[in-house]
Amino acid sequence: MPSANAQVTQQQKTAATDSVRVSLLTCAAGGEIYSLFGHTAIRYENYTRGIDAVFNYGMFNFNAPNFIFRFALGETDYQLGVTDYEHFAAEYNYLGRDVWQQTLNLTEEEKERLIALLTENYRPENRVYRYNFFYDNCATRPRDQIERAINGTLQYADNMTANSTGISFRDLLHKYSEGHLWSRFGMDLCMGSKADEPINRRLAMFVPFYMQEYFNKAQIVDKEGQARPLVAKEEKIVVTGKTPADFVSRGITPMQSASLLL
């Protein structure tokens, strides 16, 4: 099989004529601060050419100075990477994190456009971006590229912009950091009062699992007014048997630490 980098250079030319499948991958949460909310990537399969690659907007340098602090502040640089699916799946299996696949119900033209957008974004001068935990992350970037590729409009089942969820950024942070009190404590310290304001469903899509749910109920409406489901099929493709409880951190909590100082 050709390397992932070699595959990328051929994708734009072959997407229109070869048998292609494009899918959204949603990965279960892990135990590190940067993995508590899960992860999203785009899988590109070209059966004719034997290509099976994953576009991953979640690449970063964990050894960068003050990474955790800068991550919580939204001051880290991430980049788009491309890996072979086999390696991607093996890594998540090793980490004990399940992966779900939603096959996107795109036309050949839309697949071609999406691969062209991703390929352009993978150019060295374009691939690095300033990561923002809530507004510009590994979930929102794939969503935006998929929406750009659609020949028509993507209609979600719910009103995505009305502030009717009754939840805030901090609510979601606490939901997905349960059992990881030090990570929660650090992120709470870095968030301002705006984190307590109600958010709409579109903003909630910074969490990969929310985007997975909304994609399942979304429809593509083409320029002729014909509607079709965005997701043709959903399946779990990496099964590890792990649950969020397996990643709960142990030891002294922030409250216990504070009580020792009293």
Regions found by a protein language model. Give the residues of each.
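Glycine-rich catalytic cores of cysteine/serine-nucleophile enzymes that process amide/ester linkages
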Residues: D18-R97
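A structural motif
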Residues: L106-T119
